[in-house]
Regions:
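Terminal, membrane-proximal amphipathic helices
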Residues: 1-8, 202-203, 232
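Short, flexible coil/linker elements and helix-boundary hinge sites characteristic
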Residues: 6-11, 24-26, 38, 68-72, ...
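Eukaryotic partner-binding/assembly regions in large regulatory complexes
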Residues: 37-125, 129-133
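Membrane-inserting effector segments that mediate pore formation, membrane fusion
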Residues: 2-66
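Extended hydrophobic/Leu-rich segments
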Residues: 7, 31-34, 81-85, 149, ...
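Long, helix-rich, hydrophobic modules that act as membrane-proximal anchors or helical bundle/coiled-coil regulators
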Residues: 103, 107-254
Length: 254
């Protein structure tokens, strides 16, 4: 990866900004010579740079959680991070993760990628195919997706007997056993109004769309098809388990 121009952190003391700039100088560069002649492109570049500065700041906070066990950074901490990264044998990989963090939809994702980079720095994580699946998913998940992902795994914690969950179960906060009973009652009475009302609700539609999206990212797996109006079920998987652990790491600092 080529060395890049500096990206200064925003909303921080001057010395922190300057120190962070030394580290982020190896990050992503957005320079278009056309911007010198076009005020529109210059404005767009400035706005895009500010967005990436915020992403880098969140990445560093996640990195600090792992390396220093705290989120807030001093200028000395930033200098130490810079030193640790430069001498780390995985420096290129860490900078690749930083590059992905600047492209995330969610600021939470940038912070989670910082935690992952910290694990790489400390030799606690080796990048395999699953790690790249996780990185790609985090790059594309928005805050709504992350909240819905947490709902799924919180459900599995609350209903430990269940290995899969339907969207209806999440909306109604009922176990799969209760859901099957509701489905059987509908079949016996031929009254599907309860299920239909749930499935026609906008909250249901948005939640199911988000869950299907996450299954496309391979963060959740699609489970066995249920014989019901809401036939799609979702299961956790190894990548999802890793993501839930990472979320728990950053939530300890909230």
């Amino acid at each position: 990866m080529e060395n890049k121009n500096k990206l200064d952190l925003i909303d921080g003391p001057k010395d922190i900004i300057e120190t962070a700039g030394n580290l982020l100088g190896k990050g992503h560069e957005i320079v278009d010579t056309i911007s010198e002649y076009s005020p529109y492109i210059r404005l767009a570049n400035n706005l895009m740079n500010k967005r990436r500065e915020q992403k880098c700041e969140n990445f560093l906070k996640g990195l600090a959680m792992k390396v220093f066990s705290r989120e807030n950074l001093t200028s000395d901490d930033l200098q130490e991070l810079n030193r640790l990264i430069e001498k780390n044998t995985n420096m290129t990989l860490i900078l690749d993760i930083l590059e992905e963090a600047t492209k995330t939809v969610s600021n939470i994702s940038s912070k989670l990628l910082g935690v992952i980079a910290g694990q790489v720095m400390e030799g606690q994580r080796t990048f395999t195919y699953n790690e790249w699946i996780l990185t790609n998913a985090l790059k594309n998940m928005n805050d709504w997706d992350i909240d819905n992902f947490k709902k799924v795994y919180s459900y599995f914690e609350e209903h430990s007997e269940d290995r899969k969950v339907s969207t209806t179960c999440l909306i109604q906060n009922i176990s799969m056993e209760e859901y099957i009973q509701m489905r059987n009652n509908s079949l016996e009475t031929k009254d599907h109004s309860i299920q239909e009302n749930i499935m026609n609700n906008e909250e249901f539609k948005m939640l199911k769309s988000s869950l299907m999206r996450m299954s496309n990212f391979q963060i959740l797996s699609v489970g066995p098809v249920a014989f019901a109006l809401d036939s799609v079920t979702f299961e956790g998987n190894q990548v999802g388990d890793e993501l839930y652990k990472l979320i728990q790491v950053i939530e300890r600092y909230i």
